[in-house]
């Protein structure tokens, strides 16, 4: 209202007409002419709310994840490990290498959460593959930030599963109208489902080993350290 109690229009204030949420045109004209159906208006409203709460929750998840990384490397002393005082047995990295890596991973923690939110209704295998692909891109950013040093590869794997599971559970709670925090057992249950998908890698590797052995070929040099340990000792490592 103005000093004379007369409502002030947007044009008087030098502002453009309010945009329609559906088409972007003049909202008043769309409302007056009933340009859009009520079903479309409700759908768009739900989409706006979904996007808002997804982005807000993804930011919170990413902040918590990077805070955990910084707390871990800051814990001192940690004999044999990187801390604020020394590099322990890791001569190719130091405290600041971890800080650089942690900073580079922030957007990927958001991405993991968003993947779980947006694709939580897919099968566990398909959701896991989406998270794996994003995790591989996150690894590339980590190596770029650290000059080729592996500071958080295992953590990326674990956080992709955790943040992805968290995103799925948050979306389910949002659809039911439930407020955070979400049940811990629900998040742990989703982590277990996604983690079990990764164990299929070992089964595929075992089959490759059998074929190679039968053909008299040597084992592939492209195995990861985890795959080599599994082949030698049957230990599942991060996947288990």
Question: What label would you give each PLM region?
Answer:
Residues 110-168:
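Long, hydrophobic/aromatic-enriched structural stretches that serve as scaffold segments
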Residues 2-9, 13-54:
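Long, contiguous binding/interaction regions
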């Amino acid at each position: 209202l103005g000093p004379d109690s007369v409502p002030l229009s947007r044009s008087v204030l030098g502002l453009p007409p309010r945009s329609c949420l559906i088409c972007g045109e003049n909202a008043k004209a769309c409302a007056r002419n009933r340009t859009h159906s009520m079903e479309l208006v409700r759908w768009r409203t739900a989409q706006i709310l979904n996007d808002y709460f997804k982005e807000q929750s993804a930011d919170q998840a990413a902040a918590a994840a990077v805070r955990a990384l910084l707390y871990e490397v800051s814990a001192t002393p940690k004999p044999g490990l990187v801390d604020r005082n020394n590099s322990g047995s890791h001569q190719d990295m130091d405290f600041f290498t971890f800080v650089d890596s942690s900073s580079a991973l922030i957007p990927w923690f958001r991405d993991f959460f968003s993947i779980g939110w947006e694709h939580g209704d897919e099968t566990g295998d398909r959701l896991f593959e989406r998270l794996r692909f994003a995790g591989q891109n996150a690894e590339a950013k980590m190596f770029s930030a650290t000059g080729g040093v592996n500071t958080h590869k295992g953590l990326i794997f674990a956080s992709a599963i955790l943040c992805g599971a968290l995103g799925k559970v948050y979306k389910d709670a949002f659809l039911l109208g439930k407020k955070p925090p979400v049940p811990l057992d629900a998040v742990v249950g989703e982590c277990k489902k996604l983690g079990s998908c990764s164990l299929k890698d070992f089964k595929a590797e075992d089959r490759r080993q059998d074929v190679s052995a039968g053909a008299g070929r040597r084992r592939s040099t492209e195995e990861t350290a985890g795959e080599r340990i599994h082949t030698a000792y049957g230990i599942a490592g991060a996947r288990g």
